[in-house]
Regions:
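Glycine/serine-rich phosphate-binding loop and adjoining beta1-alpha1 elements at the start
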Residues: 40-56, 62-147, 213, 221, ...
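Feature captures the FAD/FMN-dependent oxidoreductase FAD-binding
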Residues: 87, 149, 154-158, 206-256, ...
Length: 499
């Protein structure tokens, strides 16, 4: 610990964000990095706790506390304070294959478990992580390092999201020949088409993919395994197969009028925008995407994807935006029932909501509300939505609390575009059926607890396809763990050390 009083001497300093009214004019990342000197002082704020909850990644009250990757946060915080940026990068790389992704899109579980955050603002570990990886690219530390020896074993990874990429990265380091199959035109999975460019610029993905290709990983895009590529051919050609296809089945909304023109799943909306931007030099060309321009938009869902839809709709030029949340508004601060270091169940106003407040003058979120009916015009186009309030009631038979409609609370609003961001229900079943793997009642691939091997010999599963919809950081962890299990099955032992 290079600065024992750092947390008292220096205040937290975050990367400055461009103002909401300015950043909605573009689709680029909108935070300005701190100078290296400023970032080093942020590293000095780390207390080097005796029990560093920031790196624990343990479940508490049903949520993770600390980093699931067990990143050595206090170590690299101290290293950057002392100016040892290369060593900080090497220490970060030990536990995290993709800090360029997590430092942009992770909700910073480490910071919410930070001991410093008990009495003042937490250490800016996410910002420090960003600075470490970007400095590594700038200085040439982040570069290809192909394995010196090949094992002669071949592994197929189906899906190029964070879990598939993490598994491919580690297995390639071990010396296995890895081929990643991706049904889309470019690798990245949800990183590319499920997360907007203003949160994760796509050249950041391309930069890392280029290194992985230089290290010997083969990417085959436009290959839809289970449809235009036979599972039997994959099983015949490769020694092991990892299914990492994500949780791509969106949860639908059942309401009269659901067939109206103008209702889309959030992932299709976000994907169409990203594809249109990259096809037209980061400009939206009319007719090439699902447009919110001039429309009254309703976003159904209060999570990260819903917020992304709010921010994207505003950049399109939406006339109005409402975001519906089934649950009541969370408290502004922790309650006694939600103590540190549990994940804080508090109200967070994210970038999209901040932008809506700046543009429209009010928070777009409407709590304890859902759609009762979609109203169509004579041509079948969506024109209005009937909303209804919800309240919490306890089921007398099960004792479970559930949100139920409040009779007589209906009201009607204008709606030209509805975006359903209600979560996902597992992977599309044509892949699991093609390989013959079993799924559980939640439609996730079925394995033994703590294991990744499926009921089919030599076939493994990881990521959201295995654990269900989750965070990028959890997907990376699953990719690392499945790589270790696959390596051991191939070699009889493994030297892939996972924290």
């Amino acid at each position: 610990m290079g600065k024992p009083t750092g947390f008292m001497d220096y205040e937290r300093q975050d990367k400055p964000a461009e103002s909401p009214l300015e950043r909605i004019k573009h689709f680029n990342e909108f935070h300005t990095p701190l100078s290296k000197e400023e970032q080093e002082l942020q590293g000095a704020r780390c207390m080097a706790c005796g029990v560093p909850f920031c790196q624990s990644g343990k479940p508490l009250a049903g949520m993770a506390s600390g980093c699931p990757l067990h990143n050595l946060v206090p170590e690299w915080n101290d290293l950057i304070y002392n100016g040892n940026w290369k060593e900080a990068y090497l220490r970060l790389k030990k536990t995290n294959n993709f800090p360029e992704f997590t430092s942009r899109v992770c909700p910073a579980l480490c910071e919410n478990a930070c001991t410093c955050g008990l009495n003042q603002e937490a250490v800016a570990s996410k910002s420090n992580e960003y600075a470490i990886i970007e400095n590594a690219y700038e200085m040439g530390y982040a570069k290809a390092n192909p394995p010196k020896v090949r094992t002669g074993k071949k592994v197929a990874v189906i899906g190029s999201g964070p879990s598939g990429l993490a598994a491919a990265d580690l297995l390639n380091r071990r010396g296995h020949q890895v081929t990643v199959f991706e049904r889309e035109d470019k690798p990245g999975g949800l990183l590319r088409y499920g997360i907007p460019n203003m949160k994760l610029e796509k050249q950041v993905i391309d930069r890392k993919i280029a290194i992985m290709e230089e290290e010997g990983i083969i990417f085959q895009t436009g290959c839809n395994v289970g449809k235009d590529v036979k599972a039997a051919d994959i099983l015949k050609e490769y020694d092991r197969v990892i299914l990492a296809c994500g949780a791509s089945n969106p949860r639908d909304i059942k309401a009269p009028g659901r067939d109206a023109q103008g209702i889309y799943f959030a992932v299709d909306f976000l994907k169409s925008t990203t594809k249109a931007l990259w096809a037209n030099d980061m400009k939206l060309k009319t007719g090439s995407y699902i447009s919110a321009k001039g429309k009254n938009v309703i976003v159904i869902g209060g999570g990260d994807t819903g917020n992304d839809c709010v921010g994207t709709s505003i950049r399109h030029g939406a006339k109005s935006v409402l975001q519906l949340e089934m649950m009541p508004k969370a408290p502004d601060e922790r309650t006694p029932m939600n103590p540190w270091p549990e994940w804080p169940r508090v109200c967070k106003t994210d970038y999209g909501q901040q932008e809506a407040i700046a543009v429209f003058g009010s928070d777009p979120r409407v709590y304890t509300t859902t759609v009762k009916e979609f109203v169509k015009d004579k041509k079948g186009n969506l024109c209005k939505a009937v909303l209804i309030k919800l309240e919490s009631k306890t089921d007398e038979k099960t004792g479970r609390k559930m949100m139920v409609p409040v009779e007589g609370s209906e009201y009607t609003v204008d709606a030209d575009l509805v975006l359903i961001a209600a979560g996902f229900l597992g992977s599309q079943d044509y892949v699991t059926k093609a390989f013959g793997v079993e799924v559980n009642e939640r439609t996730n691939v079925k394995t033994e607890a703590g294991k990744y091997s499926t009921n089919v010999k030599d076939v493994f599963a990881a990521g959201d396809m295995h654990r269900g919809q989750s965070l990028v950081v959890w997907a990376i962890r699953e990719g690392r763990e499945v790589a270790r299990e696959v390596d051991e099955s191939l070699m009889g032992y493994t030297n892939l050390y996972i924290q």
